[in-house]
């Protein structure tokens, strides 16, 4: 090897750390650039959101597939009952990896634990779930979760990791891409929910919630078949919660983003999510969506007071009036 080449290799590796004295190839995490670290955080966050979106789809399409009988209570067992435990395990795995991503970002000084006090909030929820699990009548169900709820202690622990992973996305371009993807997921769930609420398409799009009490019909209980939006989130309450959060992304993106194409995308997505929230027919959807519009309207009013551009305030006011009119019309009917 020539002296020039040898000198070049020494210069390349100079000052770089290695895990356990290993080679450079095995410790890319320590040696990755700030841009590469942000790419890792951003890409993982998008993958995590995608996994959470599609993970319940098999649960929907296996709800009528029988695989056995529970002789002790003479109850038919369905394949979707098995998926609940896989869903909880998958959420935990995604959350665990998310927390590792957070630790990597902390190592790379992309995010500091001392500067992210908001992580205490989901941690408090985790601690409360531990107490709830220990005091529950059925610790097994409280730990793993069960049908139509699935939020056992393991699942909530996974959520904490997802919050931590989301905090690592600090670069503006990565945040915009993640926001675009989240709004796209919200629009997808909204479209599914709208199709579930239309009688003509409800037969094609599966909706577990509308059949949830059908087994009791023959036993004397009154069962009314309704067309209620749930998306692929099992219940209208879950759909309302998810769409409320994502609507905040869409509304403020529509108001303040500089690119016209993205404004249009956010506006269409917001309209779809508003419609799905209305068709969910639950009070949390109305309260949540109303809070999004009111808070965004206040922010737009404050910002417009210090700026010449009044368009965000006017757009938010129009959206608020239209949504309020739709809600009022539904209640009046």
What spans do the regions from the language model cover?
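Cys/His-rich metal-coordination motifs, chiefly Zn-binding "fingers/knuckles"
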Residues: 1-2, 65
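Alpha-helical transmembrane segments of multi-pass inner-membrane proteins
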Residues: 3-8, 15-22, 33-54, 88-102, ...
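Juxtamembrane membrane-water interface segments that cap and precede transmembrane helices
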Residues: 27, 65-82, 139-142, 216-232
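Asp/Glu-centered strand-loop micro-motifs enriched in Gly/Pro and often flanked by an aromatic residue
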Residues: 29-35, 74-82, 108-115, 166
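N-terminal hydrophobic segments of proteins, predominantly signal-anchor/transmembrane helices
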Residues: 47-68, 93-160
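Membrane-interface coil-to-helix junctions
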Residues: 69-86, 120, 125, 151, ...
């Amino acid at each position: 090897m020539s002296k020039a080449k040898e000198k070049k290799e020494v210069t390349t590796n100079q000052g770089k750390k290695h895990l356990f004295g290993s080679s450079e190839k095995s410790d890319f995490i320590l040696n990755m650039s700030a841009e590469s670290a942000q790419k890792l955080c951003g890409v993982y966050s998008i993958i995590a959101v995608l996994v959470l979106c599609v993970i319940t789809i098999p649960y929907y399409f296996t709800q009528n597939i029988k695989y056995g009988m529970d002789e002790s209570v003479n109850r038919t067992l369905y394949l979707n009952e098995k998926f609940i435990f896989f869903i909880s395990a998958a959420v935990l795995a995604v959350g665990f990896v998310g927390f590792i991503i957070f630790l990597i970002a902390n190592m790379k000084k992309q995010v500091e634990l001392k500067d992210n006090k908001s992580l205490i909030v989901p941690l408090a929820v985790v601690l409360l779930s531990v107490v709830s699990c220990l005091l529950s009548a059925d610790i097994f169900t409280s730990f793993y979760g069960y049908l139509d709820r699935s939020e056992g202690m393991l699942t909530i622990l996974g959520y904490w990791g997802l919050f931590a992973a989301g905090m690592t996305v600090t670069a503006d371009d990565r945040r915009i891409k993640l926001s675009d993807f989240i709004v796209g997921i919200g629009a997808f769930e909204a479209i599914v929910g709208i199709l579930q609420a239309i009688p003509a398409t409800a037969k094609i799009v599966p909706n577990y919630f509308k059949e949830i009490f059908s087994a009791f019909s023959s036993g004397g209980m009154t069962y009314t078949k309704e067309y209620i939006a749930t998306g692929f989130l099992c219940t209208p309450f879950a759909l309302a919660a998810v769409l409320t959060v994502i609507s905040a992304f869409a509304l403020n993106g529509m108001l303040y983003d500089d690119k016209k194409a993205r404004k249009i995308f956010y506006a269409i997505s917001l309209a779809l999510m508003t419609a799905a929230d209305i068709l969910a027919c639950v009070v949390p959807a109305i309260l949540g969506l109303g809070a999004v519009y009111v808070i965004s309207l206040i922010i737009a009013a404050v910002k417009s007071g210090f700026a010449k551009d009044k368009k965000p305030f006017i757009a938010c006011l129009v959206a608020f009036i239209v949504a309020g009119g739709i809600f009022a019309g539904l209640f009046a009917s």
